[in-house]
Amino acid sequence: GVDKAKTMTELCDRQTGAVKKLIVSQNGALRGIFVARDNATKVSATDGLDADVFTALAKAQQMAEWSTTDLYAPLFFILEGRGYTGTTLKDLSNETYNRVGVLLGDTEADSQGACVGTLAGRLASLPVQRNIGRVKNGALKTTLLYVGKKKVEEDSEVISSIHDKGYIIARKYVGRSGYFFADDRLACVETDDYAHLSNRRVIDKAYRIAYNTLLDMMLDELEINSDGTMQTGVITSWQQTVENAINRSMTAAGELSAGNNGEGCSCYIDPKQNVVATSKVEMTLKVRPFGYARYVDVNLGFQVTTV
């Protein structure tokens, strides 16, 4: 088990944290890690939340980047937004933590924690490209949600402000019963390619497929030209193999946006690289994500025929 006295910052420390041991023990199987603490633990609030949340952000980002670069096992973190005080929250929308999200709100009033299990369950039920706030997903499986002492529906301006500051938060829609996540923001600038959990999960899945596909080619013999470059047939074969793997696993499953050719990715190997000299093959892989209707503006008026 995990020592309940440990802070989230300590748990996520890349050198000594228990999370690192968990990642290694699972041999790359983990796609996302949700970190929460016992509600009985003491909270020391600053900038609207337990200070531990903000110090854990950098640690979680470092851990996720280490897992990606060293283990070829990309993943994301969701941190529990503990100890919400109702005062001005720190703005996460200017940060750089594009592998970490912070969840606010709980199923109990004035709770020190957040409904991490609700978010984890919703994510587990969705394909990687799907936004957790998609209305067609249906309402969350909870009858009440609170932010601090108030129900979510009692202060829509506060909910909007929390969302704008880069937190994951639930909301209500007029005319619909139940609660929905407002969006899937991660703790970084909105212009980051991976500012949203859906894009993060898509690119991470493509990464894993490419890694697994290319691993079969490790230390394989390569037909080369007299200048040490790869022969055209070899390059074409490698590119097609990677594209086929991703298109079969993701594009065909509706997880990538297909182009006119029916493909959702493209792979390119520079034919000028001298593989004999470097023993390295460099490749560029691009995948096509979906767009999301975060705002829908309607110009509405009467249709009148003038006689």
List PLM regions with ranges:
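Catalytic cores of large soluble enzymes that bind and process phosphate-bearing ligands
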Residues: 48-55, 198, 230, 234, ...
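Residue-level marker of positions within ordered structural domains that often coincide
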Residues: 38, 247, 290
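C-terminal hydrophobic structural anchor segments
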Residues: 231-267
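Long, internal scaffold/assembly segments composed of regular secondary structure
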Residues: 84-145
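Small-residue-rich
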Residues: 1-87
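Long, contiguous, structured domain-core segments that constitute the functional module of a protein
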Residues: 119-237, 241, 284-307
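Compositionally biased, low-complexity/repeat regions
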Residues: 5-9, 259-307
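Generic structural hydrophobic/aromatic packing signal, biased to beta-strands
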Residues: 1, 33, 77, 102, ...
